[in-house]
């Protein structure tokens, strides 16, 4: 996302509130950038940003916070955001993974067949392509006996758990790993070439049935599925609706922007060459 810039008229006072008033009234997105990142720069040659100017003018600061309440229903926080921290939904936690398995196994009714326990956020995508959150031990029978997977594509950069590797070795399921970080501000984005590489793996019928997963099956998986839907000629409205349903309550605007802006020319060329399209339901 580019930085917004407000240019003062020649000779105008950079502390004047009229320019900011205009921005406040007309640009909700700019207000969001100011609130979260302090990135609305004043191009007057002194390198100061809007935050500095507002802090120097107490009256303007009070007025500005009142406007923030209108847009966000809360006061502007002075606590700086940790910009590069992993979202809890993105980072794989082996202890959490193991603990959830214990909890599920302890509460299962023994009458229930393990074959019917899919991973969280599981869904059929198209053909023999599936999506889910990170599979755990209680899901292994479902993946092998019900889905009869040939491959798993994992989209996290962390090392794959040993118990999962043992399961794959035992069943002959092939593991593909295309590690990527999630789309998070300010400048952490999924590289397009990694998405293309992942799509090439998924679309290849030789790898199907295939399961796609990240940690929670929301963001990185959602971006990949969104790009598959583009190849199916879905409308953006339908694509974003599906993305938001799986990402709820943490849908990311940057993920949806990535899906919209992703250049699929290369994967279309590869898919056409190998007769992978159109995808069959």
Swiss-Prot record:
Q: Which residues bind 1D-myo-inositol hexakisphosphate?
A: 189-190, 193
Q: What EC number(s) does its UniProt record assign?
A: 3.6.1.52
Gene Ontology CC annotations of this record: cytoplasm; cytosol
Name the enzyme's class.
Answer: hydrolase
Boundaries of every Tyrosine-protein phosphatase domain copy: 121-271
Q: Could you tell me the superkingdom of the organism this chain comes from? A: Eukaryota
The record's statement on gene disruption is: Sensitive to wortmannin; simultaneous knockout of KCS1 suppresses the effect.
- Temperature dependence, free-text field: Optimum temperature is 37 degrees Celsius.
Q: Which UniProt keywords apply?
A: Cytoplasm, Hydrolase, Phosphoprotein
Asked whether the UniProt record includes Hydrolase among its keywords, one would answer yes
Site note Transition state stabilizer, residues: 220
Compartment(s) of residence: Cytoplasm
Residues modified as Phosphoserine are 94
> InterPro entries given for it?
PFA-DSPs (IPR020428), Prot-tyrosine_phosphatase-like (IPR029021), Siw14-like (IPR004861), Tyr_Pase_AS (IPR016130), TYR_PHOSPHATASE_DUAL_dom (IPR020422)
Variation of activity with pH: Optimum pH is 6.
Q: GO molecular-function annotation terms?
A: inositol diphosphate tetrakisphosphate diphosphatase activity; inositol-1,5-bisdiphosphate-2,3,4,6-tetrakisphosphate 5-diphosphatase activity; inositol-3,5-bisdiphosphate-2,3,4,6-tetrakisphosphate 5-diphosphatase activity; inositol-5-diphosphate-1,2,3,4,6-pentakisphosphate diphosphatase activity; inositol-5-diphosphate-1,3,4,6-tetrakisphosphate diphosphatase activity; phosphatase activity
Q: Name one GO biological process term.
A: diphosphoinositol polyphosphate metabolic process
This enzyme catalyses: 5-diphospho-1D-myo-inositol 1,2,3,4,6-pentakisphosphate + H2O = 1D-myo-inositol hexakisphosphate + phosphate + H(+); 5-diphospho-1D-myo-inositol 1,3,4,6-tetrakisphosphate + H2O = 1D-myo-inositol 1,3,4,5,6-pentakisphosphate + phosphate + H(+); 3,5-bis(diphospho)-1D-myo-inositol 1,2,4,6-tetrakisphosphate + H2O = 3-diphospho-1D-myo-inositol 1,2,4,5,6-pentakisphosphate + phosphate + 2 H(+); 1,5-bis(diphospho)-1D-myo-inositol 2,3,4,6-tetrakisphosphate + H2O = 1-diphospho-1D-myo-inositol 2,3,4,5,6-pentakisphosphate + phosphate + 2 H(+)
Entry function: Selectively cleaves the beta-phosphate at the 5-position of soluble inositol pyrophosphates. Converts 5-diphosphoinositol tetrakisphosphate (5-PP-InsP(4)) into inositol pentakisphosphate (InsP(5)), 5-diphosphoinositol pentakisphosphate (5-PP-IP(5) or 5-InsP(7)) into inositol hexakisphosphate (IP(6) or InsP(6)), and 1,5-bisdiphosphoinositol tetrakisphosphate (1,5-PP-IP(5) or InsP(8)) into 1-diphosphoinositol pentakisphosphate (1-PP-IP(5) or 1-InsP(7)). Also has activity on 1,5-bis-diphosphoinositol 2,3,4,6-tetrakisphosphate (1,5-InsP(8)) and 3,5-InsP(8).
Q: What else is known?
A: Present with 4070 molecules/cell in log phase SD medium.
The record's comment on protein family reads: Belongs to the protein-tyrosine phosphatase family. Atypical dual-specificity phosphatase Siw14-like subfamily.
User: Could you tell me which PANTHER family the record lists for this protein?
Assistant: INOSITOL PHOSPHATASE SIW14 (PTHR31126:SF48), TYROSINE-PROTEIN PHOSPHATASE (PTHR31126)
This one is known as Inositol diphosphatase SIW14
| Native source organism of the sequence | Saccharomyces cerevisiae (strain ATCC 204508 / S288c) (Baker's yeast)
Q: Source taxonomy lineage? A: Eukaryota, Fungi, Dikarya, Ascomycota, Saccharomycotina
